[in-house]
């Protein structure tokens, strides 16, 4: 079970929480679609800002969006000019008042989504996949990860037949629900086709009562 399922979804309600923090009865489907639209728009708009996670909170016709990023300066801009433009764009998209909260990711080497996007970017720049994987594994362990596993799937190195290669170092206990495992997925669009990159980072165990 732990081998197949998304590690974050598997731990929801145990040690992980939801990214959409709101409750609705009648308009649930409408708000859910709005959440997906917002996340898709922000991911494209802030592609080079290293966005790790987007959380959405709603109350009384207003939306508060928490953006976790490795490069907050790029989103905020000079004297907050960029963030104001972004607020207006989001308000136009949703017809609601939108609040933005930009949070910095202090250690991007321990964020699975950022690591996977970084590897995908390297693959697009024609860096050898094994080199990109090993470099990311080394830096994550250096910054305190207990274990990391990286999987690349596709026409690796321009091979005729697609295959899957993975590299693991340390422990990655997928069946242990108290294990704090971060998961990230990214796609590298190369001249040979799309290469999928999955990253699992084990940060330690979350003990009850803490």
Swiss-Prot record:
One Gene Ontology molecular-function label: rRNA binding
PROSITE patterns, alphabetized: KH_TYPE_2, RIBOSOMAL_S3
Keyword set, alphabetical order: Ribonucleoprotein, Ribosomal protein, RNA-binding, rRNA-binding
Source organism superkingdom: Bacteria
Domain KH type-2: 38-106
Signal peptide region: none
SMART domains per the UniProt record, alphabetical: KH
GO biological process per UniProt: translation
InterPro entries noted in UniProt: KH_dom, KH_dom-like_a/b, KH_dom_type_2, KH_sf_prok-type, Ribosomal_S3_C_sf, Ribosomal_uS3_bac-typ, Ribosomal_uS3_C, Ribosomal_uS3_CS
Any Pfam family hit: Ribosomal_S3_C
Cellular component terms (Gene Ontology): cytosolic small ribosomal subunit
Role, per record: Binds the lower part of the 30S subunit head. Binds mRNA in the 70S ribosome, positioning it for translation.
PANTHER family, sorted: 30S/40S RIBOSOMAL PROTEIN S3, SMALL RIBOSOMAL SUBUNIT PROTEIN US3C
Subunit structure: Part of the 30S ribosomal subunit. Forms a tight complex with proteins S10 and S14.
NCBIfam families cross-referenced by the UniProt entry: rpsC_bact
The family this protein is said to belong to: Belongs to the universal ribosomal protein uS3 family.
Family matches, as HAMAP family: Ribosomal_uS3_B
Protein name per UniProt: Small ribosomal subunit protein uS3
Organism: Geotalea daltonii (strain DSM 22248 / JCM 15807 / FRC-32) (Geobacter daltonii)
Gene: rpsC
């Amino acid at each position: 079970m732990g081998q197949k399922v998304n590690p974050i979804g598997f731990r929801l309600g145990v040690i992980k929480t939801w990214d959409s923090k709101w409750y609705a009865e009648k308009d649930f489907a409408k708000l859910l679609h709005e959440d997906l639209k917002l996340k898709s728009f922000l991911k494209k708009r802030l592609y080079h800002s290293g966005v790790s996670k987007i959380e959405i909170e709603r109350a009384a016709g207003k939306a508060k969006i928490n953006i976790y990023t490795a490069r907050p300066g790029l989103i905020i801009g000079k004297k907050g000019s960029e963030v104001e433009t972004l607020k207006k764009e989001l308000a136009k998209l949703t017809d609601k008042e939108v609040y933005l909260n930009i949070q910095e990711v202090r250690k991007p080497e321990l964020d699975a989504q950022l690591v996977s996007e970084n590897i995908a970017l390297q693959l697009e720049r024609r860096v050898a996949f094994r080199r990109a994987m090993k470099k990311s594994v080394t830096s994550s362990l250096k910054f305190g990860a207990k274990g990391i596993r990286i999987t690349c799937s596709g026409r690796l190195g321009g091979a005729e037949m697609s295959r899957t290669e993975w590299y693991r170092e340390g422990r990655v206990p997928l069946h242990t629900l108290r294990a704090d495992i971060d998961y990230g997925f990214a796609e590298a669009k190369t001249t040979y086709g799309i290469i999928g990159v999955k990253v699992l980072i084990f940060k330690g165990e979350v003990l009850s009562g803490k």
